[in-house]
Amino acid sequence: MAQVQYYGTGRRKSSVARVRLVPGEGRVIINGRDFENYIPFAALREVVKQPLVATETLGNYDVLVNVNGGGYTGQAGAIRHGIARALLKADPEYRLTLKRAGLLTRDARMKERKKYGLKGARRAPQFSKR
């Protein structure tokens, strides 16, 4: 018998997460490692769990994630986005809950590029009056 799986792709900054939800007991596996070992900060682990907490499905699915690009914050945001999209495929009734929590919106904020003549994106070289 084929097992039911729900897929979702999440993006944040330069990170892309491919998320697979499988009915299970609530394990979160990121790149083959348990998410407590993969994400070192408790606050970011909470970010990853937000869609499951919002829809009250924390112990219902095993979450299998492949994520690459970016750092911890970008990856956590991408995983959150991917889980939210996968939950939406699992049950379309979650749309209102996830949308109100702002979990279906792709966070479009990206690093601003460095401009020539400046030291960073906006930082100008030191000004000397004399």
From Swiss-Prot:
<dbReference type="InterPro" id="IPR020574">
    <property type="entry name" value="Ribosomal_uS9_CS"/>
</dbReference>
<dbReference type="GO" id="GO:0003723">
    <property type="term" value="F:RNA binding"/>
</dbReference>
<dbReference type="InterPro" id="IPR023035">
    <property type="entry name" value="Ribosomal_uS9_bac/plastid"/>
</dbReference>
<dbReference type="InterPro" id="IPR000754">
    <property type="entry name" value="Ribosomal_uS9"/>
</dbReference>
<keyword id="KW-0687">Ribonucleoprotein</keyword>
<protein>
    <recommendedName>
        <fullName>Small ribosomal subunit protein uS9</fullName>
    </recommendedName>
</protein>
<dbReference type="GO" id="GO:0006412">
    <property type="term" value="P:translation"/>
</dbReference>
<comment type="similarity">
    <text>Belongs to the universal ribosomal protein uS9 family.</text>
</comment>
<dbReference type="InterPro" id="IPR020568">
    <property type="entry name" value="Ribosomal_Su5_D2-typ_SF"/>
</dbReference>
<keyword id="KW-0689">Ribosomal protein</keyword>
<dbReference type="InterPro" id="IPR014721">
    <property type="entry name" value="Ribsml_uS5_D2-typ_fold_subgr"/>
</dbReference>
<dbReference type="GO" id="GO:0003735">
    <property type="term" value="F:structural constituent of ribosome"/>
</dbReference>
<dbReference type="Pfam" id="PF00380">
    <property type="entry name" value="Ribosomal_S9"/>
</dbReference>
<dbReference type="GO" id="GO:0022627">
    <property type="term" value="C:cytosolic small ribosomal subunit"/>
</dbReference>
